[in-house]
Amino acid sequence: MHNYKLTIQYDGARFKGWQRLGNNDNTIQGKIESVISEMVGKETEIIGCSRTDAGVHALNQVANFQSDEKLVEHKVKKYLNQYLPNDISITNVEEVHDRFHARYNSKAKTYLYKIWNEEHTNPFMRKYSMHVNKKLNVKSMKEAAKHLVGSHDFTAFSNAKSKKKSMVREVYTLEVMEEAGFVQIRVSGNGFLHNMVRKIVGALIEVGLGQLDAEAIPQILEAKQRNQINCLAEASGLYLENVEF
């Protein structure tokens, strides 16, 4: 059995997310599986590192699939890019060890979030950022971000779909940056609960708008109550930026 690692970019705007919903419908996983299955002549499943939600994008998603036959990497890449829709791109194909698993072997993930922070809308970025038309206090956001770095129980920053044995995750870095009309947030960690990144961003937006005190973050973490964060940042601004193994 041969195991192949795919590196994938996609514009998630028109898709229902990564995870196939029972058949090869309008999901990233479904589209790629359909083309791979046609290529190898049998139904083939791919395993993604991150099950991104509807509307979320990826700069470096990683997945793997297995094949009975040995495949030529550059031919696989060419075939997939020829038959996949043009908002999904395979940037690399590599044969890896048969025990490589895209989800379970990942050691760190990095997400980038883009906020368009001008009074006027940006028509070119409406599917690729969240528009906040009031000026954000980036200094306060940076102070709040410090409280989220480290190992914490992130129940308050998840939703009801997050039913993991442990809600503890470690955030390695959390940066807030300003650049040409945008406020960008980059977060790296060993793993993330469902909606955790979007709720972290939502909390930072609330802080930036003066709706939440930066010093309230430790109490929110401690309380473990999901209703403490009112803002769930829009999917459109979120990008899976990098995965480390």
Swiss-Prot record:
One Gene Ontology MF term: tRNA pseudouridine(38-40) synthase activity
Catalysis: reaction(s): uridine(38/39/40) in tRNA = pseudouridine(38/39/40) in tRNA
Pfam families: PseudoU_synth_1
Annotated substrate binding sites: 111
EC number of the protein: 5.4.99.12
Gene Ontology terms describing biological process: tRNA pseudouridine synthesis
CDD domains in the record: PseudoU_synth_EcTruA (cd02570)
InterPro entries hit by this protein: PsdUridine_synth_cat_dom_sf, PsdUridine_synth_TruA, PsdUridine_synth_TruA_a/b_dom, PsdUridine_synth_TruA_C, TruA/RsuA/RluB/E/F_N
Entry keywords, A to Z: Isomerase, tRNA processing
UniProt-annotated catalytic positions: 53 (nucleophile)
Family according to the record: Belongs to the tRNA pseudouridine synthase TruA family.
Its biological purpose: Formation of pseudouridine at positions 38, 39 and 40 in the anticodon stem and loop of transfer RNAs.
Quaternary context: Homodimer.
Record-given protein name: tRNA pseudouridine synthase A 2
Organism expressing this protein natively: Bacillus cereus (strain ATCC 10987 / NRS 248)
Gene: truA2
